[in-house]
From Swiss-Prot:
It is found in: Cytoplasm. One of its GO terms (molecular function) is 3-deoxy-8-phosphooctulonate synthase activity. It catalyses: D-arabinose 5-phosphate + phosphoenolpyruvate + H2O = 3-deoxy-alpha-D-manno-2-octulosonate-8-phosphate + phosphate. GO terms for biological process: keto-3-deoxy-D-manno-octulosonic acid biosynthetic process. Its main location: cytoplasm. Pathway: Carbohydrate biosynthesis; 3-deoxy-D-manno-octulosonate biosynthesis; 3-deoxy-D-manno-octulosonate from D-ribulose 5-phosphate: step 2/3; Bacterial outer membrane biogenesis; lipopolysaccharide biosynthesis. This is 2-dehydro-3-deoxyphosphooctonate aldolase. It is an enzyme of class 2 (transferase). Its EC number is 2.5.1.55. One of its GO terms (cellular component) is cytoplasm. It comes from Bordetella avium (strain 197N). Keywords: Cytoplasm, Lipopolysaccharide biosynthesis, Transferase.
Amino acid sequence: MQSIQIPTGIHCANNLPFVLFGGINVLESEDLALRSCAEYVRVTDKLGIPYVFKASFDKANRSSIHSYRGPGLDEGMRIFEKVKQEFGVPIITDVHEPWQAAIVAQTADILQLPAFLARQTDLVIALAKTGKVINIKKPQFLSPSQMAHIAEKFREAGNDQLILCDRGSCFGYDNLVVDMLGFDVMTKSTGGLPVIFDVTHALQQRDPGGAASGGRRQQSAQLARSAMALGLAGLFLEAHPDPAKALCDGPSALPLAQLEPYLAQIKAIDDLVKSFDPLHID
């Protein structure tokens, strides 16, 4: 198993205690970012869970041109700096264009390659050249084994500090399912890279013809428990103080007030699964 080191001494690997990549979908305001991060830090400190704060500064792939995208690059980096100063946590955020990579890398500790852009070679090279840890979102339209080709692009560009993230696979039109066998396929096909699970976006459910995604947050705990029972390197999760008022993906977001009991269950499962001796079946 390959272990990836994240600033502040966090190690991310499939056989180590899981890392939480948690936060809000998009930066709505400085106040919301700070309040949300404060609760994440309180809960993860209490439960002993390594933690990375996540949010987007620009949701560049919204279905409607009228949908909220975020504060933009400059204001987004300012808010991230404030979060880091206040809480001392690592930051993960997504990059959509090659020219953004070097700028975002000055603030963020982990750069995320969005699922819809995962095969864009120029973006891959720009991200690789930053030398930062990279979180690669698996496109909904790719098989798990195809992630090996994306990982190889990064390695050829000089960066092997990679994490793989599954966020579900297309199942017909406007629906996603999670292939539980695919996590192991991704790890083995990439030489043991850490694999994490984005439970929030796996819960998305499109309204045919609608301009915004629906979601199934009522099934979030069941899906997260199932995936984390496989022994994964981390969980990618979004929570919001009031999901009904969230400016993006509220229907898939966990109510922030339920974060502690939710993560307590995930940690119990992770601790149990990783206490087992490896079982190799021929």
